[in-house]
A protein has these predicted regions:
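Conserved acetyl-CoA-binding loop-helix of GNAT-fold acetyltransferases
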Residues: 53-61, 181-184, 190-207, 230, ...
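Acyl-donor-binding surface of acyltransferase catalytic domains
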Residues: 48-114, 118-119, 215, 221, ...
Length: 253
């Protein structure tokens, strides 16, 4: 597994807690509160340490239950993995571009929004912004609300007056930082919230001595970057590689 993929996985393991299980060399990240979200339900690590063990592959697929989930196909994965997943009925999914930046200061940003670090009084507001931005069910709110208190995560909220406008978080461990959980309330888009949140998180990571800053988002489609992709580039992150995905759609009982 590439070092950037390892950072991403290490960041999310404390978020999933016991819902993250190992099946051989694979890690199954399971979010039963959001069974139709392949963004939250993923299998990572298959075939990266050697040839694919088909028994372990089938065990990992079984462990995901009836959720809609992605299976990550690392650039370093065994070449047979994609075909084995296709043979089991998994469809092509949306790959994720991994980005990296060094320890240079963040570009300046102008916004009327106020950036605050999340505390006990703003946990629920932060969780609501993130869940709403990704179209996730209310059942996911307690899961998101626990993230700012999870090991090594630091969460920030952008406020328009007293109204939550955007949210994001950064995981910091030794010299690595992972940027994730970013979302904006639709009516507050275009106000510079995510830019200001990037700047705040970069500042926090640099203050902690981080030298490798990592994030990811959906790969380019039709050559047109999303607003998330543009913001990532704007704040100094450089494209590194795409982790492809195979998708198994949600199975309704």
């Amino acid at each position: 597994m590439h070092a950037l993929e390892r950072i991403s996985l290490d960041a999310y393991l404390p978020v999933y807690g016991p819902a993250a299980i190992d099946v051989g060399a694979a890690t199954c990240l399971r979010a039963p509160h959001a069974p139709e979200s392949p963004m939250l339900n993923r299998v990572v690590g298959l075939g990266v340490d050697g040839p694919v063990d088909e028994a372990q592959l089938d065990g990992a697929l079984t462990a995901m239950g009836d959720t809609s989930f992605y299976v990550a196909i690392s650039p370093s994965a065994d070449a047979s993995l994609d075909g084995l997943l296709q043979a089991r009925g998994l469809e092509p999914g949306w790959g994720w571009m991994l980005f990296e930046r060094g320890p240079s200061p963040a570009p300046s940003v102008e916004t009327a929004l106020q950036i605050v670090e999340v505390d006990a009084g703003t946990l629920d507001a932060w969780a609501t912004v993130v869940a709403t931005a990704y179209g996730l069910p209310d059942d996911s709110l307690p899961w998101f609300a626990a993230i700012p208190e999870a090991t090594a995560w630091h969460a920030f909220l952008a406020l328009d007056g007293d109204e939550p406008a955007a949210a994001a978080a950064v995981w910091i461990d030794e010299h690595a930082a992972y940027f994730g959980m970013a979302g904006t309330v639709p009516e507050h888009r275009g106000k510079g919230g995510q830019g200001a949140l990037f700047a705040a998180r970069i500042e926090r990571a640099l203050a902690a001595g981080c030298t490798t800053l990592v994030t990811e988002t959906g790969e380019l489609r039709d050559g047109s970057p999303s607003s998330s992709y543009r913001n990532i580039r704007r704040y100094g992150f450089e494209e590194r590689f795409v982790v492809a995905h195979r998708l198994r759609p949600y199975r309704r009982g």
